[in-house]
Amino acid sequence: MARIGDGGDLLKCSFCGKSQKQVKKLIAGPGVYICDECIDLCNEIIEEELADADEVKLDELPKPAEIREFLENYVIGQDTAKRTLAVAVYNHYKRIQAGEKSRDSRTEPVELTKSNILMLGPTGCGKTYLAQTLAKMLNVPFAIADATALTEAGYVGEDVENILLKLIQAADYDVKRAETGIIYIDEVDKIARKSENPSITRDVSGEGVQQALLKILEGTQASVPPQGGRKHPHQEFIQIDTTNVLFIVAGAFAGLEKIVSDRVGKRGLGFGAEVRSKAEIDTQDHFAEVMPEDLIKFGLIPEFIGRLPVVASVTNLDKESLVKILSEPKNALVKQYTRLFEMDGVELEFTGDALDAIADQAIHRGTGARGLRAIMEEVLLPVMYDIPSRDDVAKVVVTKETVQDNVLPTIVPRKPSRPERRDKSA
């Protein structure tokens, strides 16, 4: 606290005029004093201005068609999932803005509840990438969590609050901004309970985690340890309201298709029922017909399913889609590796047959789009090792044989530069 001057006069705040006896603190500057009350007032004004600047106006919120169009630039296929996500995300942020307007006008209109999203589908089909691209477009904090690392409170492993800590960190510890972010929880199928019937023994990494996630999915005031985990019991907790946090929960749900198939197959019993061949049933998109009862049978608890009302399914990518993924999106792998070779002054070319062969290998390995980069790395490794040490290479051509038979890519040598002619008249 500032002290009494040499003349015995009390020091005063240069802004509000209060003496040092009327305030808790008086901070001195070069010929200026400011009290704690004026500092608090300044902070409030700054926070209000920042909040107004960060708030997305309703007319600026991209429409579902615009969201889908943006996703088309980065994600190939999965049209149904794109439409579902576009509508769900648009409605979510429209709901947030409606809540802010009702608070400002002090009216009590119809309360809009949150609709979290459940994404189903095989690995490597774009579930995570769709969520990442959405967050990028909306410019909101985005965090990815792995459900397999979570355990119920009191057991070895991560608490569910650690998911919220990742979101707060993604927002640079701006809690207000984090409260309108997106959290993507992957591998949620791995926390399904081990049997349909409730177990006598405690399932701390399955049903226990589902129970722990219920509150934050629905919306609650959560206490988050800023240093994470349970190793710092005396740390101050960060308070965050999850009411406006959008949760996208995803998993491969291997085996769910059989549960759906068994249920759908029962329709084919009795006179007049439609009878389908085994091949027709196998090729059917089972994930598109998933019902809550199927997810319960798989191992998700009814309360958990009830907090995920929007279901978006992704399908296996066919060969044509994989070839497009390699070359068409803005961040396509072919464009990425072409840029890497350009940095060494070398042109890179893939023949159409080579791209087909890469897609075939990804399908054979069962890794979907996620496996494309691994195949590209294997194919290009020998030339990526040699090219930086050579200055005689103009172009590298990757062919079908390069991919299928491990033949080295075709190397086109650089034409030697002609020596300059001397002018005889000189």
From Swiss-Prot:
SUPFAM superfamilies: Glucocorticoid receptor-like (DNA-binding domain), P-loop containing nucleoside triphosphate hydrolases. Zn(2+) binds at C13, C16, C35, C38. One of its GO terms (cellular component) is HslUV protease complex. GO terms for biological process: cell division; proteolysis involved in protein catabolic process. Residues 1-54 form the ClpX-type ZB domain. Pfam families: AAA_2, ClpB_D2-small, zf-C4_ClpX. The keyword Chaperone applies. It comes from the Bacteria. ATP binds at P122, T123, G124, C125, G126, K127, T128, Y129. One of its GO terms (molecular function) is protein dimerization activity. Keywords: ATP-binding, Chaperone, Metal-binding, Nucleotide-binding, Zinc. PANTHER family: ATP-DEPENDENT CLP PROTEASE ATP-BINDING SUBUNIT CLPX-LIKE, MITOCHONDRIAL (PTHR48102:SF7), ATP-DEPENDENT CLP PROTEASE ATP-BINDING SUBUNIT CLPX-LIKE, MITOCHONDRIAL-RELATED (PTHR48102). Component of the ClpX-ClpP complex. Forms a hexameric ring that, in the presence of ATP, binds to fourteen ClpP subunits assembled into a disk-like structure with a central cavity, resembling the structure of eukaryotic proteasomes. Belongs to the ClpX chaperone family. ATP-dependent specificity component of the Clp protease. It directs the protease to specific substrates. Can perform chaperone functions in the absence of ClpP. This is ATP-dependent Clp protease ATP-binding subunit ClpX. It comes from Mycobacterium sp. (strain KMS). The lineage of its organism: Bacteria, Bacillati, Actinomycetota, Actinomycetes, Mycobacteriales.
